[in-house]
């Protein structure tokens, strides 16, 4: 009799459990993948698409999955915090605990893995200055050269590292070099250096500007970041003499062939940055390969189940 009662109780419990989780509700595997990307001028997009093996999509929307969503770095971060079926990509320096960062080819996106070259999905942070003789006055020219030297110093490398990227050089302390730039010994509080270009580099650029100012006569700094392409246009390109001109422009991709008309000495790399595929925190996926990401962005994988069962 006790066995019969126990069996009946177990059947009742299973029945109640089935009723509490209706089988007609689609699971996560049936969710359509919502694909987010940067626009074609973005250095983040260029680095991501080339890194996953889908270079055709670096500057061409027509090869992407139908219905993709174009957004900037901050908007993609915000979207992944709420869109449980979304996927996008951002700079490692932008990643926080509101989203889930995916490993790439089984390797986590960390500064150590960028340095030891095991994390392959990365791109350069580069910068360009105005040409010699293309400054309002010599003070602005000398301040620009001093800033580039500061970025390359150990002090600059520390600022870059604190913002999540990996500096490519450390030439010694700024204190040991500042004497090479007499302009820094004078009061520069009436002078403004203008910075622009990649918005992925913005946090680093702002931090470098803030650290450089008191180290070089309290020069004023202004950061206005609108994309990697503008890093060239407003410094050496078609907008260099317009209202949006800049002294220094940043790019989160190597400058393209058509942007290399100026001398090599006007360009330099300041850091490497990992690019990270990101999803909602509740997404069960934790790692994707380049092939899987390519299939998602091509539209060959349209459901999360395609990825999970791959």
Label each PLM-derived region with a short phrase.
Residues 2-22:
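Sec-dependent N-terminal signal peptides of Gram-positive bacterial secreted proteins and lipoproteins
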Residues 19-310:
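Exported/periplasmic ABC-transporter solute-binding proteins
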């Amino acid at each position: 009799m006790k066995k019969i009662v126990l069996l009946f109780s177990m059947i009742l419990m299973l029945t109640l459990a089935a009723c509490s989780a209706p089988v007609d509700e689609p699971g996560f595997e049936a969710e359509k993948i919502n694909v987010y990307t940067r626009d074609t001028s973005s250095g983040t997009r260029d680095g991501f698409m080339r890194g996953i093996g889908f270079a055709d999509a670096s500057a061409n929307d027509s090869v992407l999955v139908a219905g993709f969503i174009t957004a900037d770095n901050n908007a993609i971060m915000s979207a992944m915090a709420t869109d449980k079926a979304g996927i996008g990509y951002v700079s490692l320096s932008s990643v926080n605990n509101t989203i889930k960062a995916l490993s790439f080819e089984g390797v986590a996106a960390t500064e150590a893995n960028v340095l030891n070259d095991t994390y392959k999905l990365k791109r350069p942070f580069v910068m360009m200055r105005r040409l010699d003789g293309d400054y309002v006055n010599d003070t602005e020219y000398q301040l620009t050269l001093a800033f580039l030297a500061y970025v390359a110093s150990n002090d600059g490398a520390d600022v870059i590292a604190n913002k999540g990227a990996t500096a490519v050089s450390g030439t010694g302390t700024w204190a040991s070099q500042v004497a090479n730039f007499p302009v820094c010994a004078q009061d520069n509080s009436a002078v403004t250096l203008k910075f622009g270009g990649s918005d992925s580099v913005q946090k680093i650029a702002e931090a470098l500007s803030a650290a450089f100012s008191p180290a070089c006569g309290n020069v004023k700094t202004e950061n206005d970041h609108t994309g990697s392409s503008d890093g060239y246009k407003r410094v050496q390109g078609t907008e260099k003499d317009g209202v949006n001109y800049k002294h220094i422009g940043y790019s989160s991709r190597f400058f393209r062939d058509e942007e290399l008309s100026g001398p090599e000495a006007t360009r330099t790399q300041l850091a490497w940055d990992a690019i990270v595929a990101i999803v909602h925190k509740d997404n069960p996926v934790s790692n994707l390969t380049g092939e899987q990401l390519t299939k998602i962005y091509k539209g060959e994988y349209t459901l999360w189940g395609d990825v999970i069962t791959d």
